[in-house]
Amino acid sequence: MAGRVKIKQKELIDSTVKNKNVMNLFHEIIGSKGNINFSVVWPKFKKIKQSVYDYISTLSVLEKASVMQNFEADKKLLELFVQKLWAAYEGYFKYPEIEKYEVEGQVNFNLVPQCVLEKFSQLYRIRINSELVTLILNSCAFMSKYNDYILKKDPYILTITPGLCFSPIPNFEDLNFKHLYNSDKNSQHDKEFIMFILYKLYTAALGVYNAISIPDIDVEDLENIILSSVSQIKKQIPRCKDAFNKIESSVHLLRKNFNTYYSDYVGSGYNPTIIMEQYIKDISQDSKNISPRISYQFRTIIKYYRDMIATRHQTMDPQVLNLVKHVEKKLDMLDREKN
């Protein structure tokens, strides 16, 4: 049954590519025009939401713990800080929206009102790029430098490392784990509890980081669009068989390197062209023995796109022009390397 579904999906993409500009399809799958793949993005969002909740809950547990009775000033500051985090969480993550349409953890998005889906789409990137999520990611980056010690609950980082401060939360140096851990007022149980809190804080922050790093798209759909578009275009461009074969045979690079491409995409401010740029670059680097003849064929394909742009510039996405320029640039670099 699964195989049939994939075949139908491929047939649908083949049909769609015939009727749509391939870069517009690329935009739709990436989500850079406001469209998002709910079956991919919704589970990702839930993971982010849960990990953010776990992060704040861990700080809340510490604030209410008996060990903090020994640090009244720190406790009060932490209490106020946690209140601010919960307020931010309520603002960004507490909308029920799609949750109420879940049945046993699954959502049939065809049954969700369009207005609900549109609202989620509008708020999705605002939420995952919020100050709250950014704070947790920065906290994760700081703690990741001590990854092995924290995951092993090794107090070395709080006892032996230089400095008087170990504050894993940006802009909140009042939460100093070295100060808490090394107090003479603590029992051994208190010390173990403090290390456990640091461990839970880090694993929750890692959960946010890992969820954020999940691509918003189905890579297989993107592969199918590339293959289907090549299949359509090569019928219109004769004597470029070798170059088209190279593109088709190199689609595995997209899947292999996609996490890197996606990180670059996010870092570029969600510019989808960066994915294609990096993909073309990797095809070039993976083709050290590419001949001048194949290089010429690549340029013929690029010329085809340039001609399309010249005749349909008002209706075609301007990103196509950028893509063509990037491909030409990579081919020029390849030619220089061979000369």
From Swiss-Prot:
Give TM regions: none
**Record's GO cellular component terms:** host cell cytoplasm; host cell nucleus; virion component
Q: What induces it?
A: Expressed in the late phase of the viral replicative cycle.
Keywords attached to this entry: Host cytoplasm, Host nucleus, Host-virus interaction, Late protein, Virion
Location(s), subcellular: Host cytoplasm; Host nucleus; Virion
Family label: Belongs to the asfivirus H339R family.
Q: How does it associate, per the subunit comment?
A: Interacts with NACA (alpha chain of nascent polypeptide-associated complex).
Q: What is this protein called?
A: Protein H339R
Organism, per UniProt?
African swine fever virus (strain Badajoz 1971 Vero-adapted) (Ba71V)
